[in-house]
Amino acid sequence: HPTLRRQRQMCIRDRYPVPPRAETQGRTEEYIGTWFKKTGLRDSYVLATKAAGPNPEFHYLRGGPRFTKEQLVEAVNGSLRRLQTDCIDLYQLHWPDRYTNFFGQRGYFHREQPETPIEETLRALEDIVQSGKVRAIGLSNETPWGTMKFLELADREGLPRVDSIQNPYSLLNRTYEIAMAEVSHREDVGLLAYSPLGMGLLTGKYRNGAKPEGSRMVVFERFTRYEGAETWEAAERYLQLADDHGI
C-alpha cells in the first residue's frame, strides 16, 4: 500500500519505532510482517500491537473478543502469525473489558454487563510474557481507575506491571491531563499518545466543510468524537494561530 510504504520509509529515515498496530487492523499487521521478512529489519524496531476488547462490531474476532486467558493466547498467536515474528515487544489491551467511558465519552454512567476480572487478565498476560511471546504489556483507552487497578493487582500479586498507556492526546483532546498524567508520572507508565492531530482536524484539510476523498472522516463516518461545534471552533482558532505565524 503506497501510504504504508511512505510510513516505512519515514521510519527507516528517522529511526522511529514501528507505529503500534492492532488485532482489529489485521491486514496492516500482515503488511508489516511481510516488510520485516523482506528487509530483515525486525530486530531494529520496537514492535507493538493490541488485543481487541468486547464490542459487537468485532464479533468475528475469536467469537466475540474478551480478555480471558484462552482468548488472549489466541489473539497473541494470531498477531505473531500475521507479523511473521516470534515475539511482540509491547502487547496492549485495546480498550477495557468492562463498561466505562472511553472513545470520546465524557461522563461515567455505571452499567452492569459481563466483564473479565482484571486479575484474570493479568495472570493470562503473565503466562504469555513467561512464554517469551511478549516482552512488555500496556493498556489503551484506559481510565485512571482501571490503570491503578492493574498496577495495584500487579504489585500485590507479583504480576507483570503495565509499562505504557496509549490514550488520545492533542490540542483538541486534553482529557489525559485530568488524573491520567499524574498516574503516568508517579507510577512510571509512559504515554503513547494517539490521534495527536485530532483525526486530521488540526491539519486544516477539513476547513470550510471540506471532506477530501479517502480522508478518515469520509471513510469512517461513524467516528464522531471530534464532531462537536466547539471542537471545530477550537480547531479553526488553532489553525488561524498557525497561519498568523507562518507554520
Where are these regions (language model features)?
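Conserved beta-strand positions
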Residues: R13, T49, L90-L93, L139, ...
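Acidic (Asp/Glu)-rich catalytic clusters
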Residues: G33-V46, R81-Q84, V129, L151-P160
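Active-site mouth loops of central-metabolism enzymes
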Residues: F58-V73, G107-T116
